[in-house]
């Protein structure tokens, strides 16, 4: 009866929150324009150039460079290769997938305005993939002195037994859902640990708040899998205008979407127990996190022709205001040997989806400056510099409040993230109908500690062939970064060092409309 009364009270006043972390924030808010083959082959360095459909997403003034209406469509093959090191165990895992990563068009309206100072207005609409979330890595059969029991103990200590256990004749599903809705995420994890026999109370009184483990200390054989799916994308409505012969202006209104799904599994076994005592010898723990939502942002940009061959560009990207909803599913199975040597298997499969209250994320704003040299029909070169302060990223409830959980998370973001500087340089050489392209970029780490997450560096190459009214382009990109992946946020916090290589091949078709 005690928990029933508390259930009603908490249902009225509390929010059900999962323990979001900095990694979740970066996964959701990654906004790196994928773009067309031409755009990508020059490392996305188009800030002072324009005249390319994907460049509109980088600088909205780029649409005003077009003299004709254009349509563009791109396809990408994306391969991620992860070299994983965890407690001196190594594994390499590759994952590839195909996608339509870009589509868009612009419509040019020339000779507007009575004074003829406004040379043209351009309307554009485009879709660009901003993050490919398809990824996999795993490490098999590594030896650890830390058990998964530490995760359940970290969540359980200090919680009342009657708040993390099922009532008599209550199903696992009913108890799991009720405890999650009533008390929140840590209680739900403690419930799984208790009902699976991994943890045991010091006493079986309702007010007990101290727990020990039924997994004997020693060494543990573990295997860890992480599988991610989904995409982040950006839909842009653009208006651009040319004023006189030297000034190009643009505005983007952007809709963003997030579709992220992560599934991880930990398998653990041990032979540490002694005869005559209860020992949990095997654990299989599965977690699935799904996050999806939408956001809104604007961009303001300008390009100035200082001379016939020299251009400057500047862009302001507003924060993206996201609204995110998360869902989780869990499964836990254990095998134990009791004091008499008999074996038992416990399977906790709630068959329930936890839907958590929506929350908002405000990403950092960004400022970009660009310089380009255009050598008539012979070629061009462009340099972009961007600055983005990740420490200003902020979580809030859907009502705009910063509760205790989000206050702690925002404080962690402020203390661990920093200003990221990005540098891109791209060049194109033209020879009759052929174009040859190359680029290089450095995307600064959002972390103050670059050992936690390194800079992302890479190069790109590409070619293009121009027909009478259309162009076909092909690009090759290769990027590298290293980062640490925590197995869990509490207890079992070992870190896997991941060396990630990303190879992307794109094909684009562009045509005059």
Each language-model region and where it sits:
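Outer-membrane beta-barrel porins/channels
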Residues: 20-34, 108-513
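Active-site-proximal flexible loops/turns
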Residues: 9, 66, 259-261
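Short structured motifs
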Residues: 58-59, 493
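N-terminal targeting signals for Sec/Tat export/insertion, comprising classic cleavable signal peptides
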Residues: 30-48
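Outer-membrane beta-barrel translocator/receptor signature
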Residues: 37, 49-58, 64-137, 141-142, ...
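Bacterial Sec-dependent N-terminal signal peptides
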Residues: 1-25, 513
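Short, charged, low-hydrophobicity "junction" segments
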Residues: 43-51, 412-415
């Amino acid at each position: 009866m005690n928990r029933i009364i508390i259930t009603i009270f908490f249902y009225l006043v509390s929010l059900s929150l999962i323990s979001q972390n900095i990694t979740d924030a970066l996964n959701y808010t990654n906004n790196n324009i994928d773009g067309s083959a031409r755009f990508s082959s020059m490392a996305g360095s188009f800030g002072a150039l324009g005249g390319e459909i994907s460049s509109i997403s980088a600088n909205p003034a780029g649409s005003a460079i077009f003299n004709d209406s254009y349509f563009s469509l791109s396809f990408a093959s994306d391969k991620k290769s992860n070299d994983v090191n965890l407690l001196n165990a190594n594994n390499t895992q590759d994952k590839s997938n195909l996608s339509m990563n870009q589509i868009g068009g612009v419509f040019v309206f020339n000779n507007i305005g009575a004074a003829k100072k406004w040379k043209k207005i351009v309307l554009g609409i485009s879709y660009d993939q901003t993050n490919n979330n398809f990824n996999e890595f795993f490490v098999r059969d590594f030896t650890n002195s830390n058990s998964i029991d530490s995760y359940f103990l970290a969540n359980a200590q200090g919680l009342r037994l009657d708040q993390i256990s099922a009532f008599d004749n209550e199903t696992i599903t009913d108890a799991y859902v009720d405890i999650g809705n009533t008390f929140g995420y840590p209680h739900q994890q403690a419930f799984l640990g208790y009902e699976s026999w991994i943890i045991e109370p010091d006493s079986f009184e309702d007010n007990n708040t101290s727990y020990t483990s039924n997994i004997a200390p020693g060494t543990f054989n573990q295997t860890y899998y992480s599988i991610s799916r989904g995409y982040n994308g950006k839909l842009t409505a653009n208006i651009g205008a040319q004023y006189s012969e030297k000034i190009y202006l643009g505005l983007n209104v952007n809709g963003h979407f997030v579709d992220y799904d992560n599934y991880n599994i930990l398998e653990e076994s041990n032979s540490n127990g002694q005869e005559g005592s209860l020992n949990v010898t095997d654990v299989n723990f599965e977690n699935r996190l799904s996050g999806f939502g939408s956001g809104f942002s604007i961009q303001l940009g300008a390009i100035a022709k200082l001379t016939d061959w020299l251009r400057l560009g500047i862009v302001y990207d507003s924060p993206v205001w996201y609204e995110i909803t998360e869902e989780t599913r869990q499964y836990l199975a254990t095998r134990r040997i009791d004091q008499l040597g008999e074996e038992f298997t416990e399977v906790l499969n709630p068959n329930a989806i936890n839907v958590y209250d929506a929350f908002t994320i405000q990403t950092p704003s960004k400022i970009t400056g660009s310089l380009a040299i255009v050598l008539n029909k012979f070629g061009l070169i462009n340099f972009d510099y961007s600055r983005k302060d990740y420490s200003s990223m902020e979580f809030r409830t859907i009502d705009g409040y910063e509760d205790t959980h989000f206050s702690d998370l925002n404080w962690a973001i402020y203390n661990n993230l920093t200003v990221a500087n990005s540098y891109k340089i791209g060049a194109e050489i033209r020879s009759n109908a052929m174009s040859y392209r190359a680029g290089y970029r450095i995307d600064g780490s959002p972390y103050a500690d670059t050992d936690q997450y390194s800079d992302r560096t890479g190069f790109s190459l590409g070619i293009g062939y121009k027909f009478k009214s259309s162009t076909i382009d092909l690009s090759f990109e290769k990027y590298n970064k290293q980062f640490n992946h925590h197995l869990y946020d509490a207890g079992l916090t070992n870190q896997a060092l991941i060396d990630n290589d990303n190879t992307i091949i794109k094909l684009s078709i562009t045509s005059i409309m």
